[in-house]
From Swiss-Prot:
Gene giving rise to this polypeptide: comGA
Protein name in UniProt: Competence protein ComGA
CDD domains the UniProt entry points to: PulE-GspE-like
Species the sequence originates in: Halalkalibacterium halodurans (strain ATCC BAA-125 / DSM 18197 / FERM 7344 / JCM 9153 / C-125)
Keyword presence, Disulfide bond: no
Function of the protein: Required for uptake of DNA by competent cells.
Listed Pfam families: T2SSE
Any GO molecular function: ATP binding
Record has Membrane as a keyword: yes
Length: 348
């Protein structure tokens, strides 16, 4: 193996052992800079010689199937590796040309056992609400939240819980597939092959599904087909970007979905947020990203779950200004799970 190959594997192993979700490789005129995304925060990791950084960039581009000679345009690609303990890891590599350096961001997706749904919410009563939703046989369940807030992790956990409760045919349509699961029929987008969400949804509906999961509703076509699939007697789960749970209604209306269709088909809208818990060692939520406390315990999710009467009121009023997550933050403060400073930072 070449030296740069060994260096790249060592870097990936260090990131995985630290629990990093992303690796950022950038540079100045003098040297290369490596940073890890740990618990939602960007943390400096290492400075390396500029020549080594440039060779690492070329290596990751080649491994991800990118054009190593193209340095003027952004590129994105993927690669799969087995690094440690025989756990496969999917890497999504993205490049961005800058005046000084071709920056690279690498998203890490370890293909390990999905989280149990009960372990995700900080407030345990919300786990039961999520489990209850998966007893539904039809309708549209939407998850919203910021990038990196754990929406897809929650979706996988909800699907896994549904599968444990009854034998179901679950079809997922994703870009990319983040967790391979042999119990699901998984379909990955490929724009070069003209495999879009629209194509995937049409194919999924012909595949006799009980449950359809859509990685993200991005445009009007996907939104319309998601609603149509739910109207034809399927349970559909999807993520969508909006400011809060109520803002999801406005977002879908802006995409051209009729409000009366939403009233008929939507069974729940879930806003999700990851918050930092108090560290029992540092006695604070503001401890070092490299704290030795187990990384997967440092953050937990809170939810604003709109269903039943509250959902119907939101669909009638269509008021996106109310943020239900604020109520859950205050509840978490009262229970001593998080600090008031953390809640205020999230509310900004």
């Amino acid at each position: 193996m070449t030296t740069i190959h060994n260096q790249s594997r060592k870097l990936l192993l260090q990131a995985l052992r630290q629990g990093a979700s992303d690796i950022h490789l950038s540079g100045t005129r003098e040297d290369g800079i490596i940073q890890f995304r740990l618990n939602g925060r960007l943390a400096p990791f290492q400075r390396i010689p500029l020549q080594t950084a440039e060779r690492l960039v070329s290596h990751f581009k080649f491994s991800a199937g990118l054009d190593i000679g193209e340095r003027r345009k952004p590129q994105s690609g993927a690669m799969d590796l087995i690094l440690e303990q025989k756990i496969p890891v999917s890497l999504r590599v993205s490049t961005l040309p800058t005046p000084l350096f071709e920056a690279v961001a690498i998203r890490l997706h370890p293909q390990q056992t999905p989280f149990a749904l009960e372990s995700i919410p900080l407030i345990k009563r919300q786990a039961q609400q999520l489990i209850s939703l998966m007893t539904r046989t039809q309708g549209l369940i939407l998850l919203t939240g910021a990038t990196g807030s754990g929406k897809t992790t929650t979706l996988y956990a909800m699907l896994q819980k549904a599968l444990h409760m009854q034998n179901l045919h679950i079809v997922t349509i994703e870009d990319p597939i983040e967790q391979l699961n042999p119990a699901f029929t998984q379909f990955e987008m490929n724009e070069k092959a003209q495999l879009t969400y629209e194509v995937g949804l049409k194919a999924a509906l012909r595949h006799d599904p009980d449950v359809i999961m859509i990685g993200e509703i991005r445009d009007q076509t996907t939104a319309v087909y998601a609603v149509r699939a739910a109207l034809t007697g399927h349970l559909v789960l999807a993520t969508i970007h909006s400011a809060n749970a109520r803002g999801t209604i406005t977002r879908l209306c802006e995409m051209g979905v009729a409000l009366h269709d939403l009233r008929e088909v939507v069974v729940a809208i879930i806003a999700q947020e990851l918050i930092s818990r108090k560290c029992p060692l540092c006695l604070s939520s503001d401890c070092s990203p490299y704290c030795t406390w187990l990384n997967n315990r440092k953050r937990a999710a809170i939810f604003d779950i709109l269903e039943g009467k509250a959902l119907q009121e939101a669909l009638t009023a269509n008021d996106s200004s109310f943020d239900g997550l604020g109520k859950e933050r205050r509840f978490a403060i009262a229970l001593g799970y998080i600090e008031e400073k953390e809640a205020k930072n999230r509310a900004l």
